[in-house]
Amino acid sequence: MSCRLLFLILFSVTVHYLNAQVVRFSENDTTYIFGDKVNVRSESSTTAATVAQLVAGDEVIIIGETETKTTLNGVELPWYQIRFQNNQKGYVWGGLLSVLRKSTLKDVRFVAGVTKAVKPKADEAAQYSIEVRAIRNGTVLQKVANTIKNEGSMYYRPLEVGARGLKGYKALLIVEMGYEACGYPWNEWYILWNGSQLHSLPLCESVADGGVFAHVERYEFPQGPDENTPGHIGKEDEIFFTIEFSATEELEDASGYNEDSWKRSRKLRWDGKQWLKPVNMGIPKD
């Protein structure tokens, strides 16, 4: 049984509504500039002449991906030819484009990108520094950052206006990273917007291995992600961190299996500055 199918069967609330796309730009895609001040080049090179300068949040249309790749701060990405203001054309490095594509709430634009990649050891997964920014009229209002240790692909979900009914918040962003394969971790980063500030939630990490085991982490809000998935039964200003676990072990004499499964949910705590994950999330006692 595949890991994707296992997640669907055991914990359909987690991935049933997933609408992620691999962050790879195609012709006619529209996105925003992620960098603060970005020089648009005449060719796909950092030494080419500058034809224009764009600021964070400026909208661009992808003409096409080039064969040229550049590595900056450990991040290797291709260059793209783009079209921008007044039908001008030029080239920018992929790391300066937002992976969130068009994510807007009124006059605020949200962008995200990888700012750095470090591989501590040859046999360890790379650590990616990811940043999300809220921008109005070219000015960065606020930004939050996180480090994800994962070499899978980066995915994103559409901006969720209303933040799933969480009182005091206007929107929810979710950035994901991982492999769609057994035995590899899958990370989810939730970011909340209250109209003036971005609040980052602690990372969720899930992993599954065929029909052997599955460990799924997620956040539950007052409202579910879709009409078929209910929210939690707590208050409107509460977020719950939930872990669901399932494992199957064959008996030594091959006469059968032992199955173990449990679910645990605990409220996050707001300390006045940030949301803190509950610490009492261990394996339930028999």
Question: Which residues does each predicted region cover?
Answer:
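Short, solvent-exposed loop/turn segments at conserved positions within beta-propeller repeat blades
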Residues: 73-75, 121-128, 182-186, 258-262
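Surface-exposed loop/turn elements that mediate protein-protein interactions on large endomembrane-trafficking
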Residues: 132-149, 189-203, 268-277
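SH3-family beta-barrel domains
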Residues: 21-45, 51-59, 63-66, 73-75, ...
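Short aromatic loop motif centered on NTY/YTY
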Residues: 160-161, 167-168, 174-180, 185-188, ...
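Bacterial Sec-dependent N-terminal signal peptides
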Residues: 1-24
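Hydrophobic beta-strand positions in blades of beta-propellers and related beta-sheet-rich domains
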Residues: 40, 127-134, 188-191, 247, ...
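Terminal domain-start segments
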Residues: 97-158, 257, 281-282
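Boundary regions of SH3-family modules and the immediately adjacent low-complexity/disordered segments
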Residues: 22-25, 74-118, 186-205
